[in-house]
């Protein structure tokens, strides 16, 4: 073999020897690269979660990678759910205690590939979110102050509004119902059905199969009502103080305005002014009674009582006269008794009960007060109407009825004296109602009496922790 052939054979051998070595080096490089890539994937995770608290918000910050994907959604209960495309450092899996009234805790869930953080929100608070750079971070700001309403149409002409707010740490919650007069009529209901008594709002709602019911009148320790009440054209109670009332006019129009009552009894002996209707007779008064008061007047025999039908005396008693439909009892003591004494069965006794216009022709009235809103402006008439400090003096649960710009009627009940709702002063309540587009509104009895019933179910949280028996309810009944 010549030298040239020997050289060629040697070179081929060297190449053949080097090829496995090169392949080995290439394979080794691939293994190293694979290992590095794998380690990078394993280390690609959310390594840091932190938070800060300020007077107006709680900020939660996530350190995320360049290729991290995420999805943020608020759940119906207010919690904020953040889904990540990579796992979270295991040190956070036990959760994070934020210890704030708005955001008490962060729940953390993670597997080898994805993760989820649930920001527990005590209230259905609004939030903002965004990113910060260098390094990349996701932040979520949960607002401590909020105000929102949830609206739900229950049926044609009936819409429920649930209101929630938190301002400067003060929470408020109200339940409201917008009712169309086209589909519903507005009916005052007595606690005893056809008699004056106390009962729960839900019971009064059941009396008339109401779609909506809320508490209405002020009342005494007995069964007396404070304010003018008129049901289906019949007067049930009175008050000599002018008070604001809600009612239904002769043409069916809902109306809010000042209600003024006066009464006079005319006889051949002279005229006497009426002290009131279906109230407590005192030692010097002329009180009228009708069938709505109960079975009888319940008076002692210190006075004189005339049972009157069609302006004629049909019976004379000294007290505790029976009360029948179509009859009215004139019960007098003191000076009124002196004037009316000596009248007999068959004598004329004309009883006049007078209401100011347009209430004189109204079918239904609930006189309560004070007025809250007039022509879209705050108008608190508590001083004029001589409303006591127990109503005006502090934040409390509130009940009102208002007439909206569109002519619909708004039933409104605000919770109070509870952690979830502080309650409002009257002027706060008035401004709140104006925010709901109320044009005119009157305040009803509040405090532990405040209650709203929809479809037979209580939808607010009475401050007594249970239903309080009350004197009257305003209801909306399907036409």
Predicted regions and their residues:
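Accessible peptide chain termini
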Residues: 1-2, 135
